[in-house]
A protein has these predicted regions:
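Short hydrophobic segments within beta-strands
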Residues: 60-63, 163
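Alpha-helical cap/lid subdomain in secreted, periplasmic
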Residues: 52-55, 76, 80-100, 105, ...
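N-terminal secretory targeting modules
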Residues: 1-60, 67-74, 87-93, 200-203, ...
């Protein structure tokens, strides 16, 4: 089953320090552009509330080489950095990271792997990243939606965030994957939206963002 978007704005739990709230509120234009949609934040608010209370929370990351951290130090991939940021933001060392990124794999392979590599870990929050590994064909679209459906409706009812990356040549499956996110009311992050203005103006070059085309 899908869930529609809600209108109330996203807010951090009251238990978070004022300093952390101020830091969150000082997002750059680039960071604001990256948020394609806040979606339905109820599950995310619940997870963040547990983090703020110091509870044990499992955050899983499923995707391709960008998630795995191909060509970068293991502490430099976004899964590692995001988990560390959450630990710092919520002053909670009980946040566990499960990095299920695997280079060169699409959402079709992700669907085959998701039970063992993600759902068996009982995640509370799942990030999905397959925008540059999937194809823009009907099979890939169906597999991606099946993967999202499987995770959203899994036993732990995790919060799910979709991440849309982009290749140096502009290739991305963001548009068709975003339609799935809209149908399920999911928060969505767009790397392309974050980077494009700076890339077009020359303020950034691709090597500032990535060591390879992805």
């Amino acid at each position: 089953s899908t869930s529609g978007s809600i209108s109330e704005p996203f807010s951090l739990p009251a238990a978070i320090s004022e300093q952390a709230k101020q830091e969150y509120g000082q997002a750059t234009d680039q960071e604001r552009r990256a948020v394609r949609s806040e979606g339905n934040v109820r599950r995310l608010q619940k997870v963040f509330g547990r983090m703020a209370e110091g509870g044990e929370v499992t955050v899983a990351y499923l995707g391709g080489s960008i998630t795995e951290g191909y060509l970068v130090n293991s502490k430099q991939n976004y899964a590692y950095k995001t988990t560390d940021w959450l630990k710092e933001l919520f002053a909670n060392d009980n946040i566990r990271r499960v990095n299920a990124g695997l280079s060169g794999t699409s959402s079709t392979i992700g669907l085959l792997r998701v039970q063992k590599d993600v759902l068996d870990e009982k995640p509370d929050l799942v990030f999905i990243e397959f925008a540059v590994n999937d194809a823009n064909d009907i099979t890939s679209k169906l597999m991606y939606e099946s993967l999202v459906n499987r995770i959203v409706n899994s036993e732990t009812a995790p919060a799910v965030v979709l991440i849309f990356t982009v290749l140096e040549n502009g290739y991305t499956c963001e548009e068709h994957q975003a339609k799935v996110g809209e149908a399920y009311g999911l928060p969505m992050i767009s790397v392309n939206a974050a980077l494009s203005p700076e890339m077009e103006s020359g303020a950034l070059v691709w090597s500032d963002y990535a060591q390879d085309e992805a």
